[in-house]
Amino acid sequence: MAKKIVGFIKLQVPAGKANPSPPIGPALGQRGLNIMEFCKAFNAQTQGVEPGLPLPVVITAFADKSFTFVIKTPPATVLIKKAIKLDKGSSNALSTKVGKITRAQLEEIAKTKLKDMNAASVDAAVRTLAGSARSMGVTVEGL
């Protein structure tokens, strides 16, 4: 018989830098999960990823205090900022533009994120990412 699921915990944790401090410690502690076990397992799985890159993780907590977790791809906004070497998006996206991104760059990001997106094709994913870029104040070229 399958284990009884008591809840899901969604967090964004920097790659290779999971530690028991907030937000990880309190979130896992509430469910009675072993915090250090998660930190060690997460850091081991994210060794090949660029350190500090925020990764969404979904932790499934079971009734017997065990857990499993799934690491997703980095948020689209982080990948867009990284692609155009930007520190942060525009505070007013309509009037203040902070950079430009090409369709080719968006296609690279779309191929990375496709498994975590609800888009049917790379082209649909590119259009979704273009919307995210525009909302950050980034001009999209070639779309």
From Swiss-Prot:
Keywords: Methylation, Ribonucleoprotein, Ribosomal protein, RNA-binding, rRNA-binding. It holds the Pfam family Ribosomal_L11_N. It comes from the Bacteria. One of its GO terms (molecular function) is large ribosomal subunit rRNA binding. One or more lysine residues are methylated. GO terms for cellular component: cytosolic large ribosomal subunit. The keyword Ribosomal protein applies. PROSITE patterns: RIBOSOMAL_L11. GO terms for biological process: translation. The keyword Membrane does not apply. Belongs to the universal ribosomal protein uL11 family. Forms part of the ribosomal stalk which helps the ribosome interact with GTP-bound translation factors. Part of the ribosomal stalk of the 50S ribosomal subunit. Interacts with L10 and the large rRNA to form the base of the stalk. L10 forms an elongated spine to which L12 dimers bind in a sequential fashion forming a multimeric L10(L12)X complex. This is Large ribosomal subunit protein uL11. It comes from Acidovorax ebreus (strain TPSY) (Diaphorobacter sp. (strain TPSY)). The gene is rplK.
